[in-house]
Regions:
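Histidine/acidic-residue-rich, glycine-tolerant segments that coordinate divalent metal ions
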Residues: 140-222
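N-terminal helical capping/dimerization or prosegment-like subdomains
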Residues: 1-97, 310, 314, 329
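Active-site metal-coordination/substrate-binding segment of hydrolases
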Residues: 80-148, 168
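Short beta-strand/turn micro-motifs at beta-sheet edges
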Residues: 188-192, 300-305
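Acidic-enriched catalytic cores of C-N bond-cleaving enzymes acting on peptides and small amides
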Residues: 192, 213-295, 323-343
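Short, solvent-exposed beta-strand/turn "edge" segments of beta-rich domains on protein surfaces
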Residues: 219-220, 302-309
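Active-site-adjacent substrate-binding region
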Residues: 231-232, 361-380
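A short beta-alpha structural unit
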Residues: 316-320, 346-362
C-alpha cells in the first residue's frame, strides 16, 4: 500500500484521537483550570507515543511545575542521524465560551476543517506526529527523540529552564517543530526562525481606595485612565510600536505577505487600516510588536460611579530574529515605568522570555528551501 493511502486510512483514527485530546482542558494556569487537566493530557501523550514504539518514556517535572513528556525511539542504525520531535499539549484559555462559534473543547468539523481549542496549536501537531509514525511503521531510517511540553502558551519558562540542564538527553541533529503555519492552505512552508517573546504585567496605582466620582472626579487621578494613557505610548498614530530603545525600522527582504491576503488571514473588518509604516512582512517578521492581552478593570455591567484606585494590564512583546528578548523586555519595563502619567506609581512584573530567536538557520541540517519530501507530498 502506498504511503498516501496508508495516511488516508489512518485519518479516522487521527480525528477520533484528536477529539479525545481536545476534550482535555489543558490550560496550564491553575487559577483557571485544575492542574489535573494538564496531568491527563501529559499521560495521554505518553501512552499514545508508547503505542508507536517510543521507550524510556517519562514525565519530567520542569521549573514552573509543568510536566514535559520525554521519550526515545532507536532507529535501525545507531549511527544514523537523530531527529527530535517537538510539540506542546497545553492550550490557551477559551476566554468567553459564548464568543465561540463551536464548543471550544469539542472537536467540530466545519467546511472540511476541524475546530476546537488546540486542534491546530498544538494538539493537532501531536496527532500529526503519531499519524506519520503509524503510516511509516518500521520504515523510519533515523533515531527519534520526543519532547512535548506543558506550559508553552503561558510563557513561564518551564522548558526553557529544562533544556540547558538536559542538553545531552535532548541532543539531536535536527529538531522538528511543527507549531508553525503554512504560506496558505495547501501551500507548505519551512519556518527557519521564530519571533522571540516576553510577557509583562504592568500595574498602575493612584489612590488608596475607590472614591465617588460625583465628589472627586476632575482633580483626582483615575488609575484606569492613567493605564490607558500609558498603553497609548506604546504605539504612534500610524500604529508603529514605539518602545523606547527598540529599533522599529528594520525591513524584511524575504518573500512578502501580500496585504490583501493578510487582511483576509487576520480577519480585518472592512475599512480598518493595517498598522505601521512598513510592509506587512516588515511589521510581522522584522520589527517588535506589543499586544495588550488583558486588562483588569470593572466590567461595564455592574460598574459603579467610582474612580478606580488601581488597574493593570498584561502585555505581550514579540521581537524579531536577532533582537535579544531579555534586553527587549528590560526596555519595555523601563518605558512603562517612565511613561506613567500624573505621578501615578507603575510596577511591572515579568515572565521569563520564552525564546531567543536568531536570524536564519542555525546550522547545515536546517533547509533553506523545502526538502523534496514536502514537494512530493504537496504535489507542487
Amino acid at each position: 500500500m502506498e504511503l498516501r493511502d496508508r495516511i488516508a486510512g489512518l485519518m479516522g483514527q487521527a480525528r477520533a484521537e484528536l477529539a479525545e485530546l481536545v476534550a482535555i482542558r489543558s490550560v496550564a494556569d491553575p487559577r483557571q483550570f485544575p492542574p489535573s487537566e494538564c496531568a491527563r493530557a501529559a499521560r495521554w501523550v505518553l501512552d499514545h507515543f508508547a503505542q508507536v514504539g517510543f521507550t524510556d518514556l517519562r514525565l519530567e517535572e520542569t521549573a514552573d511545575g509543568s510536566q514535559a513528556v520525554y521519550g526515545a525511539r532507536p532507529g535501525p542504525d545507531p549511527a544514523a542521524p537523530t531527529v527530535l520531535l517537538y510539540a506542546h499539549y497545553d492550550v490557551q484559555p477559551p476566554l468567553d465560551d459564548h464568543a465561540w462559534r463551536t464548543p471550544p473543547f469539542q472537536l467540530t468539523e466545519v467546511d472540511g476543517r476541524w475546530y476546537g481549542r488546540g486542534a491546530a496549536d498544538c494538539k493537532g501537531n501531536i496527532l500529526m506526529h503519531l499519524t506519520a509514525l503509524r503510516a511509516l511503521g518500521d520504515q523510519v531510517p533515523v533515531n527519534l527523540k520526543l519532547i512535548v511540553e506543558g506550559s508553552e502558551e503561558q510563557g513561564t519558562g518551564g522548558l526553557e529552564d529544562y533544556v540547558p540542564r538536559h542538553a545531552d538527553q535532548l541532543r539531536a541533529d535536527a529538531i522538528l517543530v511543527c507549531d508553525t503555519g503554512n504560506a496558505a492552505v495547501g501551500v507548505p512552508a519551512v519556518t527557519v526562525s521564530l519571533r522571540g517573546l516576553a510577557n509583562v504585567v504592568v500595574s498602575v496605582e493612584a489612590l488608596s481606595s475607590e472614591v465617588h466620582s460625583g465628589m472627586y472626579s476632575g482633580p483626582a487621578p483615575d488609575a484606569l485612565a492613567a493605564l490607558i494613557h500609558l498603553l497609548a505610548t506604546l504605539r504612534d498614530r500610524a500604529g508603529n510600536t514605539t518602545v523606547t530603545g527598540l529599533d522599529n525600522t528594520q525591513t524584511w527582504d524575504g518573500v512578502p505577505w501580500p496585504p490583501e491576503q493578510f487582511r483576509t488571514d487576520a480577519c480585518l473588518l472592512p475599512g480598518v487600516s493595517l498598522l505601521g509604516d512598513g510592509t506587512v512582512s516588515d511589521m510581522v517578521w522584522a520589527r517588535p510588536a506589543v499586544t495588550v492581552l488583558g486588562i483588569d478593570c470593572p466590567p461595564v455591567v455592574g460598574s459603579a460611579a467610582a474612580i478606580q484606585p488601581h488597574a493593570r494590564a498584561r502585555l505581550n512583546l514579540r521581537v524579531p530574529p536577532g533582537m535579544d528578548p531579555v534586553e527587549a523586555q528590560d526596555a519595555l519595563v523601563a518605558h512603562l515605568e517612565a511613561a506613567a502619567p500624573w505621578g501615578c506609581g507603575s510596577r511591572s512584573s515579568e515572565n521569563p522570555p520564552a525564546s531567543r530567536s536568531r536570524p536564519g538557520p542555525a546550522g547545515p541540517p536546517t533547509p533553506r528551501s523545502p526538502p523534496p519530501c514536502m514537494t512530493r507530498s504537496a504535489g507542487r
